[in-house]
């Protein structure tokens, strides 16, 4: 039995898809455990780039099982579209498994998401308007519709009718929005369920059976630790738990079966949407990193906010998610800069602090304390080992490792699978 969890250790978009794809080569089962189609992941290999939102990165390996766990909120329309996208590109989805306990995103969730965000005016949290939050709200309120319900026509009809009556009253009285039609949603989404039914099963059984039989299982998170609803920059967070602890709830696998937690991070920091960002750059360097790193949202296409590497954030991620290894991505993006800064602490009310405050008021008053390192000019996109890197690039990686207190197991010097370089095999010591 061996398992590895890949989490984003910043604010998402850290290259989890690439690292998951890379680690999938030695896994037999790959599983998503939370989130929805609000976050995309990009995988590049053999000269082609694929962008997915719901289906795990392991789908590109025909000999591996890919699982969408019960902690995911699933938009059937998006999933059917994604399946067609893969089929059109010659990718088989025969090994996909979908949890019958996953909750379903329906049109009223998406409408409500947009209405709630618009009503906040200057206090927007930067939702992607994919219905994620409202779907998790229904789940917590025990009125959600699960995949198992979607497949049972009478059950789906009854629950949809009840929920839609309530949502339509809310739309009309609270927001002045026209009601949604039951017939339009019911027929369309029941049909989606029929298209998906052959993939649906109890994925907790599949995952536990795999682990108990000695297979390697890789768990893939969405978003990042700093967007976790409990441990992130609340309320500027997602509605689920991307931290490694979310695996046990979102997949039905007990905590004793988790062996390693790999934190994916960039050699700098990025963020999409509103919320605190202590090391954010508002200058030409930030613009340069954004363009060189193609820092635009996979799903939203919004330009990402850019900042220096923040070791305070990373130590927080290490603590709350139990990071055992780091995968450092996008080192090549920093090539050409004369100097590179790393945030080592914050200054708050004249004192240095080394933890990430919960209070938004305190966060807004924090000033990053920087350490400046010399940059490098050499092209590193073909480097395969640490020794191949320029001395300044090596020193930068070592300094990140020292400040975070977690060993760097891989570093990447480009978007392709072949540009990911292994320093320590995560699977080897389990």
Swiss-Prot record:
Name recorded for this polypeptide: Adenylosuccinate synthetase
Task: Provide the residue positions that the database annotates as binding GTP.
Answer: 12-18, 40-42, 304, 330-332, 412-414
Q: Where in the cell is it found?
A: Cytoplasm
Is Magnesium one of the keywords UniProt gives this record?
Answer: yes
| Alphabetized UniProt keyword annotations | Cytoplasm, GTP-binding, Ligase, Magnesium, Metal-binding, Nucleotide-binding, Purine biosynthesis
* One GO CC annotation: cytoplasm
As recorded in UniProt, its EC number(s) are 6.3.4.4
Protein function = Plays an important role in the de novo pathway of purine nucleotide biosynthesis. Catalyzes the first committed step in the biosynthesis of AMP from IMP.
Question: In which organism is this protein found?
Answer: Ligilactobacillus salivarius (strain UCC118)
